[in-house]
Swiss-Prot record:
GO terms for cellular component: cytoplasm. The keyword Transcription does not apply. One of its GO terms (biological process) is protein K69-linked ufmylation. It holds the Pfam family UFC1. This is Ubiquitin-fold modifier-conjugating enzyme 1. The active site is at C116. It comes from Drosophila persimilis (Fruit fly). CDD domains: UBCc_UFC1.
Length: 164
């Protein structure tokens, strides 16, 4: 079900242990430390392998996340804003990652630019609570979505390259 490349990526992202969401204020701080550690390791591994593709930051409480993600297609870099909130029932409920500027441009998206992850990612997340975190959502949710949807949107002329 999971290919070798995905398995290798996953093996380089630390699994999380603390089961806490934003409502559990004291324990949430510990969970956030685990989240940041996993994200730092994932980004570091991406840079080392030449596949750096996103930047994220959060508000002080760690409940709102935002940043940029990008996808390379035919040697052109397509960049998108990315954002998501941590659900109050996290980590039982996965974050809903949104790319607001692509809202309404593909059927594999919900209102507000939230990408569709129900068929493949959410069952995997549910089997791995509380071990999966934000880095896993990026690796197993957003990355494959970008790899499938962005080239299709480019080929259809729905999104075009913007000079920087």
């Amino acid at each position: 079900m999971v290919d070798d490349s995905t398995r290798k990526t996953l093996s380089n992202i630390p699994l999380l242990q603390i089961r806490a969401g934003p409502r559990e204020k004291d324990v949430w701080v510990q969970r956030l430390k685990e989240e940041y550690h996993a994200l730092i390791m994932y980004v570091k591994n991406n840079k080392q392998s030449g596949s750096d593709w996103f930047r994220l930051e959060s508000n002080k409480e760690g409940t709102k996340w935002f940043g940029k993600c990008w996808y390379m297609h035919n040697l052109l870099k397509y960049e998108f804003d990315v954002e998501f909130d941590i659900p109050v029932t996290y980590p039982t409920t996965a974050p809903e990652i949104a790319l607001p500027e692509l809202d309404g441009k593909t059927a594999k998206m919900y209102r507000g630019g939230k990408i569709c992850l129900t068929d493949h990612f959410k069952p995997l997340w549910a089997r791995n609570v509380p071990k999966f975190g934000i880095a896993h959502a990026m690796a197993l949710g957003l990355a494959p979505w970008l790899a499938v949807e962005v080239p299709d949107l480019i080929e259809k002329g729905i999104i075009t390259y913007k000079e920087k």
